[in-house]
């Protein structure tokens, strides 16, 4: 961690004192602060020291700079890298893709701020970490001259912001994220991701990049079906935000967990219980990872007590 701190301070300057939210929610100032990481994400040095996960994120904002215009018969001199092998196999003669210059790109974040995201045992809640990740992607989109759109889901309502490339639009998104982050501390709702995903599916263009930022605790069959459809049309990223307590059971002892007015006491002395505990979350993660593998999505995990940039550095 000491090396990471020196590296980040070298590129970003000393980190300002924590403002406001104290990990319970992301303040507008904290969301705006995420912009300070953008120059480094775009820098040459970034390519040499980040993990493969971070490289996957960066690739969403680069693209080819072109979009598919048509598919026609292969002609002498065409780039063989543009051959459409599916059409070629079907028609038994070579076909190639023709591309036109892409003016801009749409980047979407589906931000899950429903009830199960209001949980955290170290540093900050999952909802807070997810909010900061969404803000970082937004700033990176604007810097790259892409249009950024966001769907903020609180378990009941979905707040839709259409893609645009403007600071005013970005500020409106950040204000709503912070506002919802405060409100869900008092009243939160459990809901399926299928609701915001269906709204996105109705309007999204092909070749867009979509980041679903969630803990995927409500990753039901309906949500999987919609995401599978989106994966065929877009570059889809599953950003799995989780707490360390969801990764492994705490040390042997008795613990109490509170959710609203409900209280649950559990005993971790028994090794059998600790193994069952670990396997429960490991199996859920494996289901999501298998979905991503099957539908060619990118899976990236962020733990709340590490922060996005620590995650990018840790697989050096």
Model-derived features: where do they sit?
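A positional/architectural concept
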Residues: 61-65
């Amino acid at each position: 961690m000491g090396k990471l701190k020196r590296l980040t301070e070298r590129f970003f300057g000393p980190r300002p004192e924590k403002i406001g939210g104290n990990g319970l929610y992301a303040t507008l100032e904290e969301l705006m602060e995420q912009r300070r990481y953008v120059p480094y994400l775009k820098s040459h040095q970034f390519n040499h020291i980040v993990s493969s996960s971070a490289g996957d994120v960066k690739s969403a904002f680069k693209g080819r700079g072109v979009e598919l215009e048509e598919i026609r018969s292969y002609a002498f001199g065409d780039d063989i890298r543009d051959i459409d092998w599916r059409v070629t196999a079907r028609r038994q003669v070579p076909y190639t893709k023709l591309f036109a210059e892409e003016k801009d790109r749409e980047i979407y974040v589906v931000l899950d701020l429903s009830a199960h995201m209001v949980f955290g045992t170290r540093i900050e809640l999952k909802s807070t970490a997810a909010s900061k990740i969404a803000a970082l992607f937004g700033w990176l989109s604007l810097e790259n001259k892409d249009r950024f759109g966001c769907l903020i889901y609180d378990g009941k309502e979905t707040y839709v912001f259409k893609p645009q490339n403007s600071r005013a639009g970005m500020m409106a998104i950040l204000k709503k994220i912070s506002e919802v982050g405060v409100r869900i501390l008092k009243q939160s709702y459990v809901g399926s991701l299928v609701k915001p995903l269906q709204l996105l599916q109705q309007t999204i263009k092909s070749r867009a990049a979509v980041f679903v930022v969630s803990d995927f605790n409500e990753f039901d069959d309906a949500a999987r079906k919609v995401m599978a459809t989106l994966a065929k049309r877009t570059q889809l990223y599953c950003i799995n935000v989780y707490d360390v307590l969801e990764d492994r059971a705490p040390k042997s002892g008795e613990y109490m967990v509170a959710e609203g007015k409900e209280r649950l006491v559990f005993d971790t002395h028994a090794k059998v219980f600790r193994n069952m505990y670990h396997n429960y979350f490991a199996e859920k993660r494996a289901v999501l990872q298998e979905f991503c593998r099957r539908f060619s999505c990118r899976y990236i995990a962020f733990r709340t007590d590490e922060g996005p940039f620590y995650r990018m550095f840790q697989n050096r």
